[in-house]
Amino acid sequence: LIYLLIGAILFGCQLNPSLSKSKLDIDRLSLIDEMIEKAIKKNKIPGAVALIAKDNEVVYKKAFGVKDPETGEKLKTDDIFRIASMTKAITSLGIIMLWEKAMIYSLDDPIDLYIPEFRTLKVLDNFNKKDSTYTSKPTNKKITIRNLLTHTSGMGYDEIGSSEIRAIIFKEKQKFMRNSVIAFSDEDVTIGEIVRRLAKLPLEFEPGVKWNYSNSIDVLGYLIEIVSGKTLDEFFKDEIFTPLGMNDTYFYLPEGKNSRLVKVQTKKEEKWVTFRHDRYNVNYPIEGAKKFYSGGAGLSSTAEDYFKFLSVFLNDGKYNDIQIIGKMTNKLLQLDQIAMITSDKHKGSHGLISTVVREEDLNKGNIGSAGTLHGGGYFNTKYFADPNEKVIGILLKQTRSISEHTSNKFNRLVFSSITQ
Protein backbone atom coordinates (compact mmCIF):
# COMPACT_ATOMS: atom_id res chain seq x y z
CA LEU A 1 0.00 0.00 0.00
CA ILE A 2 2.83 2.38 0.88
CA TYR A 3 4.53 1.75 -2.47
CA LEU A 4 1.24 2.31 -4.31
CA LEU A 5 0.72 5.57 -2.44
CA ILE A 6 4.22 6.83 -3.28
CA GLY A 7 3.69 5.89 -6.91
CA ALA A 8 0.40 7.75 -7.02
CA ILE A 9 1.99 10.86 -5.55
CA LEU A 10 4.83 10.81 -8.06
CA PHE A 11 2.42 10.26 -10.95
CA GLY A 12 0.20 13.13 -9.80
CA CYS A 13 3.17 15.47 -9.66
CA GLN A 14 4.48 14.33 -13.04
CA LEU A 15 7.97 14.07 -11.65
CA ASN A 16 10.57 12.87 -14.12
CA PRO A 17 12.50 9.79 -12.94
CA SER A 18 15.67 11.81 -13.52
CA LEU A 19 14.66 14.12 -10.65
CA SER A 20 16.54 11.92 -8.19
CA LYS A 21 19.74 12.63 -10.16
CA SER A 22 19.03 16.30 -10.79
CA LYS A 23 20.67 17.82 -7.68
CA LEU A 24 17.26 19.21 -6.69
CA ASP A 25 15.84 18.26 -3.30
CA ILE A 26 12.59 16.31 -3.81
CA ASP A 27 11.21 17.19 -0.38
CA ARG A 28 11.81 20.89 -0.95
CA LEU A 29 10.17 20.75 -4.38
CA SER A 30 7.09 19.17 -2.82
CA LEU A 31 6.55 22.49 -1.06
CA ILE A 32 5.61 23.94 -4.47
CA ASP A 33 2.56 21.66 -4.59
CA GLU A 34 1.62 22.75 -1.10
CA MET A 35 2.10 26.44 -1.88
CA ILE A 36 0.01 26.43 -5.09
CA GLU A 37 -2.73 24.22 -3.65
CA LYS A 38 -2.95 26.51 -0.63
CA ALA A 39 -3.24 29.56 -2.92
CA ILE A 40 -6.10 27.88 -4.80
CA LYS A 41 -7.84 26.87 -1.57
CA LYS A 42 -7.56 30.45 -0.25
CA ASN A 43 -8.97 31.74 -3.56
CA LYS A 44 -5.79 33.64 -4.45
CA ILE A 45 -5.54 32.01 -7.89
CA PRO A 46 -7.85 29.72 -9.91
CA GLY A 47 -5.04 27.50 -11.18
CA ALA A 48 -1.55 27.27 -12.65
CA VAL A 49 0.84 25.13 -14.65
CA ALA A 50 4.34 24.82 -13.18
CA LEU A 51 7.45 23.48 -14.91
CA ILE A 52 10.99 23.05 -13.61
CA ALA A 53 13.96 21.86 -15.66
CA LYS A 54 17.45 21.05 -14.46
CA ASP A 55 20.43 20.17 -16.64
CA ASN A 56 18.29 20.16 -19.80
CA GLU A 57 15.61 17.81 -18.49
CA VAL A 58 12.11 18.62 -17.32
CA VAL A 59 12.03 17.22 -13.79
CA TYR A 60 8.73 18.68 -12.62
CA LYS A 61 5.59 19.52 -14.58
CA LYS A 62 2.17 19.79 -13.01
CA ALA A 63 -1.21 21.41 -13.56
CA PHE A 64 -3.30 22.73 -10.68
CA GLY A 65 -6.84 24.07 -10.51
CA VAL A 66 -9.40 25.17 -13.05
CA LYS A 67 -9.01 26.26 -16.67
CA ASP A 68 -12.57 27.50 -17.26
CA PRO A 69 -14.67 28.98 -14.43
CA GLU A 70 -17.92 28.36 -16.29
CA THR A 71 -17.44 24.65 -16.98
CA GLY A 72 -15.08 23.79 -14.13
CA GLU A 73 -12.72 22.08 -16.59
CA LYS A 74 -9.39 21.25 -14.97
CA LEU A 75 -6.08 22.61 -16.22
CA LYS A 76 -3.76 20.27 -18.11
CA THR A 77 0.00 20.61 -18.46
CA ASP A 78 -0.25 21.03 -22.25
CA ASP A 79 -2.87 23.78 -22.14
CA ILE A 80 -2.08 26.97 -24.04
CA PHE A 81 -1.64 30.33 -22.29
CA ARG A 82 -1.48 33.89 -23.57
CA ILE A 83 2.14 34.63 -22.69
CA ALA A 84 1.86 38.32 -23.66
CA SER A 85 5.16 40.08 -22.82
CA MET A 86 7.02 36.77 -22.69
CA THR A 87 6.81 37.24 -26.48
CA LYS A 88 9.39 40.01 -26.14
CA ALA A 89 12.28 37.63 -25.42
CA ILE A 90 11.46 35.66 -28.58
CA THR A 91 11.34 38.79 -30.74
CA SER A 92 14.57 40.05 -29.21
CA LEU A 93 16.23 36.72 -30.00
CA GLY A 94 15.07 37.15 -33.61
CA ILE A 95 16.85 40.51 -33.79
CA ILE A 96 20.03 38.98 -32.34
CA MET A 97 19.88 36.17 -34.92
CA LEU A 98 19.68 38.69 -37.77
CA TRP A 99 22.53 40.71 -36.25
CA GLU A 100 24.68 37.57 -35.98
CA LYS A 101 24.08 36.87 -39.67
CA ALA A 102 25.13 40.47 -40.51
CA MET A 103 21.66 41.19 -41.91
CA ILE A 104 21.63 43.99 -39.34
CA TYR A 105 24.97 45.82 -39.37
CA SER A 106 25.08 47.04 -35.79
CA LEU A 107 22.87 47.02 -32.71
CA ASP A 108 23.74 50.71 -32.50
CA ASP A 109 22.26 51.43 -35.93
CA PRO A 110 19.61 54.16 -35.79
CA ILE A 111 16.23 52.57 -36.40
CA ASP A 112 15.49 55.21 -39.06
CA LEU A 113 17.95 53.43 -41.37
CA TYR A 114 15.26 50.76 -41.70
CA ILE A 115 12.04 52.61 -40.82
CA PRO A 116 12.20 56.15 -42.30
CA GLU A 117 9.18 57.37 -40.29
CA PHE A 118 11.54 57.62 -37.29
CA ARG A 119 13.71 60.28 -38.99
CA THR A 120 11.77 63.22 -37.57
CA LEU A 121 11.70 62.24 -33.91
CA LYS A 122 10.24 64.58 -31.33
CA VAL A 123 10.16 64.51 -27.54
CA LEU A 124 7.24 65.64 -25.37
CA ASP A 125 7.58 69.24 -24.16
CA ASN A 126 4.23 70.21 -22.58
CA PHE A 127 1.02 68.24 -22.07
CA ASN A 128 -2.52 69.49 -21.37
CA LYS A 129 -4.40 66.94 -19.24
CA LYS A 130 -7.79 68.47 -20.04
CA ASP A 131 -7.83 67.55 -23.73
CA SER A 132 -4.60 65.55 -24.27
CA THR A 133 -3.12 68.24 -26.52
CA TYR A 134 0.62 68.67 -26.34
CA THR A 135 3.66 70.44 -27.69
CA SER A 136 6.88 68.71 -28.64
CA LYS A 137 10.39 69.54 -29.78
CA PRO A 138 13.01 67.77 -31.92
CA THR A 139 15.16 65.20 -30.14
CA ASN A 140 18.93 65.52 -29.87
CA LYS A 141 19.48 61.80 -30.40
CA LYS A 142 18.22 59.04 -32.63
CA ILE A 143 16.68 55.78 -31.41
CA THR A 144 19.01 52.82 -31.89
CA ILE A 145 18.20 49.12 -32.09
CA ARG A 146 19.95 48.70 -28.73
CA ASN A 147 17.66 51.36 -27.23
CA LEU A 148 14.66 49.39 -28.46
CA LEU A 149 15.97 46.08 -27.10
CA THR A 150 16.59 47.57 -23.65
CA HIS A 151 13.50 49.82 -23.35
CA THR A 152 15.58 53.00 -23.35
CA SER A 153 14.11 54.45 -26.56
CA GLY A 154 11.83 56.99 -24.88
CA MET A 155 8.72 55.29 -26.30
CA GLY A 156 5.74 54.42 -24.12
CA TYR A 157 2.83 51.99 -23.91
CA ASP A 158 -0.90 52.52 -24.37
CA GLU A 159 -1.96 50.40 -21.38
CA ILE A 160 0.75 50.96 -18.76
CA GLY A 161 3.33 53.62 -17.88
CA SER A 162 3.20 57.41 -18.22
CA SER A 163 -0.37 58.78 -18.19
CA GLU A 164 0.64 61.50 -20.68
CA ILE A 165 2.06 59.08 -23.24
CA ARG A 166 -0.85 56.67 -22.74
CA ALA A 167 -3.30 59.48 -23.47
CA ILE A 168 -1.38 60.58 -26.58
CA ILE A 169 -1.20 57.05 -27.98
CA PHE A 170 -4.86 56.42 -27.19
CA LYS A 171 -5.94 59.60 -28.98
CA GLU A 172 -3.91 58.69 -32.08
CA LYS A 173 -5.17 55.12 -32.00
CA GLN A 174 -8.81 56.23 -32.12
CA LYS A 175 -8.20 57.59 -35.62
CA PHE A 176 -7.79 54.13 -37.13
CA MET A 177 -8.76 51.50 -34.52
CA ARG A 178 -11.65 50.67 -32.23
CA ASN A 179 -10.93 51.07 -28.52
CA SER A 180 -8.45 48.23 -28.38
CA VAL A 181 -5.11 47.79 -26.68
CA ILE A 182 -2.49 47.70 -29.44
CA ALA A 183 -0.75 44.55 -28.18
CA PHE A 184 -3.93 42.46 -28.29
CA SER A 185 -5.57 43.84 -31.42
CA ASP A 186 -8.01 41.59 -33.27
CA GLU A 187 -8.51 44.20 -35.99
CA ASP A 188 -7.63 44.26 -39.67
CA VAL A 189 -4.32 46.09 -39.20
CA THR A 190 -0.68 45.07 -39.52
CA ILE A 191 2.25 45.71 -37.22
CA GLY A 192 3.82 47.88 -39.93
CA GLU A 193 0.81 50.21 -39.99
CA ILE A 194 0.88 50.57 -36.21
CA VAL A 195 4.64 51.17 -35.95
CA ARG A 196 4.66 53.81 -38.69
CA ARG A 197 1.99 55.73 -36.77
CA LEU A 198 3.77 55.34 -33.42
CA ALA A 199 6.93 56.76 -35.00
CA LYS A 200 5.19 60.10 -35.47
CA LEU A 201 4.22 60.46 -31.79
CA PRO A 202 6.44 62.25 -29.26
CA LEU A 203 8.83 60.33 -27.02
CA GLU A 204 8.57 60.64 -23.25
CA PHE A 205 12.30 61.43 -22.99
CA GLU A 206 15.48 61.58 -25.10
CA PRO A 207 16.64 58.15 -26.33
CA GLY A 208 19.20 56.45 -24.11
CA VAL A 209 18.78 58.51 -20.94
CA LYS A 210 16.16 56.48 -19.02
CA TRP A 211 14.48 53.09 -18.89
CA ASN A 212 10.76 52.85 -19.64
CA TYR A 213 8.79 49.71 -20.50
CA SER A 214 7.31 50.33 -23.93
CA ASN A 215 6.08 49.34 -27.38
CA SER A 216 9.70 49.20 -28.54
CA ILE A 217 9.70 45.43 -29.10
CA ASP A 218 6.77 45.82 -31.49
CA VAL A 219 9.02 48.13 -33.50
CA LEU A 220 11.63 45.36 -33.52
CA GLY A 221 9.03 42.86 -34.70
CA TYR A 222 8.41 45.10 -37.69
CA LEU A 223 12.17 45.44 -38.20
CA ILE A 224 12.42 41.64 -38.42
CA GLU A 225 9.78 41.71 -41.17
CA ILE A 226 11.68 44.40 -43.11
CA VAL A 227 15.10 42.74 -42.85
CA SER A 228 14.00 39.11 -43.33
CA GLY A 229 11.38 39.72 -46.01
CA LYS A 230 8.95 37.51 -44.07
CA THR A 231 6.03 38.23 -41.78
CA LEU A 232 6.97 37.94 -38.12
CA ASP A 233 4.79 34.83 -37.94
CA GLU A 234 6.71 33.19 -40.80
CA PHE A 235 10.10 34.19 -39.38
CA PHE A 236 9.31 32.73 -35.97
CA LYS A 237 8.08 29.47 -37.49
CA ASP A 238 11.05 29.07 -39.84
CA GLU A 239 13.89 30.26 -37.61
CA ILE A 240 12.80 29.49 -34.03
CA PHE A 241 9.65 27.40 -33.53
CA THR A 242 10.26 24.62 -36.06
CA PRO A 243 13.99 24.18 -35.25
CA LEU A 244 13.24 24.04 -31.50
CA GLY A 245 10.14 21.84 -31.85
CA MET A 246 7.87 24.53 -30.38
CA ASN A 247 4.75 23.02 -31.89
CA ASP A 248 2.21 24.78 -29.67
CA THR A 249 3.34 28.41 -29.94
CA TYR A 250 1.30 30.74 -32.14
CA PHE A 251 0.08 34.25 -32.71
CA TYR A 252 -3.26 32.72 -33.69
CA LEU A 253 -4.16 29.17 -32.76
CA PRO A 254 -5.18 26.68 -35.44
CA GLU A 255 -8.84 25.77 -35.00
CA GLY A 256 -8.05 22.27 -33.76
CA LYS A 257 -6.22 23.70 -30.73
CA ASN A 258 -8.74 26.37 -29.72
CA SER A 259 -10.12 24.21 -26.90
CA ARG A 260 -6.69 24.17 -25.24
CA LEU A 261 -6.63 27.95 -24.74
CA VAL A 262 -7.00 28.76 -21.04
CA LYS A 263 -9.68 31.27 -20.02
CA VAL A 264 -8.46 34.51 -18.43
CA GLN A 265 -10.11 34.81 -15.02
CA THR A 266 -10.78 37.49 -12.45
CA LYS A 267 -12.68 37.62 -9.18
CA LYS A 268 -16.18 39.00 -8.80
CA GLU A 269 -17.78 38.84 -5.36
CA GLU A 270 -15.05 36.36 -4.37
CA LYS A 271 -15.93 33.99 -7.23
CA TRP A 272 -13.76 33.31 -10.27
CA VAL A 273 -15.36 34.47 -13.52
CA THR A 274 -14.21 34.88 -17.12
CA PHE A 275 -12.34 38.17 -17.50
CA ARG A 276 -13.55 40.67 -20.09
CA HIS A 277 -12.14 44.06 -21.05
CA ASP A 278 -13.91 46.95 -22.76
CA ARG A 279 -10.78 47.96 -24.71
CA TYR A 280 -9.74 44.65 -26.25
CA ASN A 281 -11.03 41.19 -27.08
CA VAL A 282 -9.52 38.75 -24.56
CA ASN A 283 -10.08 35.97 -27.10
CA TYR A 284 -7.70 37.59 -29.60
CA PRO A 285 -5.67 34.35 -30.08
CA ILE A 286 -8.70 32.63 -31.64
CA GLU A 287 -10.91 35.45 -32.97
CA GLY A 288 -10.74 38.50 -35.24
CA ALA A 289 -8.79 39.35 -38.39
CA LYS A 290 -5.67 37.40 -37.30
CA LYS A 291 -3.30 39.73 -39.16
CA PHE A 292 -1.60 41.60 -36.34
CA TYR A 293 1.70 40.01 -35.27
CA SER A 294 2.69 41.79 -32.07
CA GLY A 295 6.35 41.16 -31.29
CA GLY A 296 5.79 42.69 -27.88
CA ALA A 297 2.87 40.64 -26.59
CA GLY A 298 1.08 38.60 -29.25
CA LEU A 299 2.08 34.97 -28.69
CA SER A 300 0.37 32.12 -26.87
CA SER A 301 2.32 29.05 -25.79
CA THR A 302 2.72 26.13 -23.40
CA ALA A 303 5.10 25.59 -20.49
CA GLU A 304 6.89 22.85 -22.44
CA ASP A 305 7.42 25.03 -25.52
CA TYR A 306 8.76 27.94 -23.51
CA PHE A 307 11.14 25.59 -21.74
CA LYS A 308 12.57 24.65 -25.15
CA PHE A 309 13.04 28.31 -25.99
CA LEU A 310 14.76 29.15 -22.69
CA SER A 311 17.02 26.11 -23.00
CA VAL A 312 18.87 27.90 -25.81
CA PHE A 313 20.31 30.35 -23.27
CA LEU A 314 21.50 27.58 -20.93
CA ASN A 315 23.37 25.64 -23.60
CA ASP A 316 25.71 28.03 -25.39
CA GLY A 317 22.98 29.08 -27.82
CA LYS A 318 21.63 25.68 -28.82
CA TYR A 319 18.94 23.15 -27.93
CA ASN A 320 19.02 19.45 -28.86
CA ASP A 321 22.11 20.12 -31.01
CA ILE A 322 20.28 22.81 -33.01
CA GLN A 323 22.48 25.92 -32.90
CA ILE A 324 20.29 29.03 -32.76
CA ILE A 325 22.93 31.62 -31.83
CA GLY A 326 26.68 31.46 -31.21
CA LYS A 327 28.32 30.74 -27.86
CA MET A 328 29.89 34.19 -27.49
CA THR A 329 26.64 35.91 -28.41
CA ASN A 330 24.83 33.86 -25.80
CA LYS A 331 27.25 35.14 -23.14
CA LEU A 332 26.53 38.70 -24.27
CA LEU A 333 22.83 38.18 -23.58
CA GLN A 334 23.55 37.54 -19.89
CA LEU A 335 25.00 41.04 -19.38
CA ASP A 336 23.22 44.15 -18.14
CA GLN A 337 23.04 46.81 -20.87
CA ILE A 338 21.67 49.77 -18.90
CA ALA A 339 23.98 50.14 -15.89
CA MET A 340 25.07 53.63 -16.97
CA ILE A 341 21.51 55.01 -17.11
CA THR A 342 19.88 53.28 -14.15
CA SER A 343 18.02 55.95 -12.18
CA ASP A 344 16.25 56.25 -8.84
CA LYS A 345 13.03 55.40 -10.67
CA HIS A 346 14.43 52.17 -12.10
CA LYS A 347 17.18 50.49 -10.13
CA GLY A 348 16.94 47.24 -12.04
CA SER A 349 18.73 45.90 -15.09
CA HIS A 350 17.98 44.88 -18.64
CA GLY A 351 19.93 42.86 -21.16
CA LEU A 352 19.40 42.38 -24.88
CA ILE A 353 16.77 39.68 -24.31
CA SER A 354 15.15 40.36 -20.95
CA THR A 355 15.80 41.52 -17.42
CA VAL A 356 19.04 39.96 -16.09
CA VAL A 357 20.38 39.33 -12.60
CA ARG A 358 23.61 41.25 -11.84
CA GLU A 359 26.28 40.51 -9.24
CA GLU A 360 25.06 43.45 -7.16
CA ASP A 361 21.54 41.96 -7.11
CA LEU A 362 22.57 38.72 -5.40
CA ASN A 363 22.17 40.08 -1.88
CA LYS A 364 18.39 39.99 -2.44
CA GLY A 365 18.54 36.19 -2.26
CA ASN A 366 16.84 33.39 -4.22
CA ILE A 367 16.76 35.21 -7.54
CA GLY A 368 19.31 33.05 -9.31
CA SER A 369 22.93 33.46 -10.28
CA ALA A 370 24.37 36.49 -12.06
CA GLY A 371 23.29 36.24 -15.69
CA THR A 372 19.89 34.71 -14.93
CA LEU A 373 17.24 35.85 -17.42
CA HIS A 374 13.74 36.47 -16.12
CA GLY A 375 10.48 38.07 -17.12
CA GLY A 376 6.73 37.71 -17.31
CA GLY A 377 3.51 38.57 -19.08
CA TYR A 378 0.39 40.70 -18.67
CA PHE A 379 -1.89 37.76 -17.87
CA ASN A 380 0.24 36.57 -14.93
CA THR A 381 2.89 34.34 -16.50
CA LYS A 382 6.49 34.18 -15.25
CA TYR A 383 9.81 32.55 -16.14
CA PHE A 384 13.47 32.44 -15.19
CA ALA A 385 16.49 30.71 -16.71
CA ASP A 386 19.73 30.42 -14.71
CA PRO A 387 22.66 29.56 -17.03
CA ASN A 388 25.06 28.82 -14.17
CA GLU A 389 22.86 26.39 -12.26
CA LYS A 390 21.23 25.23 -15.52
CA VAL A 391 17.77 25.51 -14.00
CA ILE A 392 14.58 26.82 -15.60
CA GLY A 393 11.34 27.71 -13.83
CA ILE A 394 8.05 28.54 -15.54
CA LEU A 395 4.77 29.35 -13.80
CA LEU A 396 1.79 30.06 -16.04
CA LYS A 397 -1.51 31.54 -14.86
CA GLN A 398 -4.25 33.48 -16.67
CA THR A 399 -5.61 36.18 -14.39
CA ARG A 400 -6.18 39.93 -14.34
CA SER A 401 -7.01 42.54 -11.71
CA ILE A 402 -5.82 40.50 -8.75
CA SER A 403 -2.80 40.71 -6.46
CA GLU A 404 -1.01 37.57 -5.24
CA HIS A 405 2.52 36.28 -4.72
CA THR A 406 2.71 32.71 -6.04
CA SER A 407 5.27 33.58 -8.72
CA ASN A 408 7.79 35.01 -6.25
CA LYS A 409 7.22 32.10 -3.89
CA PHE A 410 7.69 29.64 -6.76
CA ASN A 411 11.05 31.17 -7.67
CA ARG A 412 12.22 31.02 -4.08
CA LEU A 413 11.17 27.39 -3.65
CA VAL A 414 12.91 26.31 -6.85
CA PHE A 415 16.20 28.02 -6.02
CA SER A 416 16.15 26.79 -2.42
CA SER A 417 15.77 23.22 -3.71
CA ILE A 418 19.24 23.36 -5.32
CA THR A 419 21.30 21.53 -2.71
CA GLN A 420 24.30 20.25 -4.69
Predicted regions and their residues:
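Bacterial Sec-dependent N-terminal signal peptides
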Residues: 1-23
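Short, surface-exposed beta-strand/loop micro-motifs that present aromatic residues
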Residues: 372, 379-389
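Short, surface-exposed loop or secondary-structure junction motifs
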Residues: 122-367
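Short, conserved catalytic-motif segment at the N-terminal edge
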Residues: 23-83, 103-105, 123-128, 284, ...
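A generic structural motif
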Residues: 65-67, 279, 399
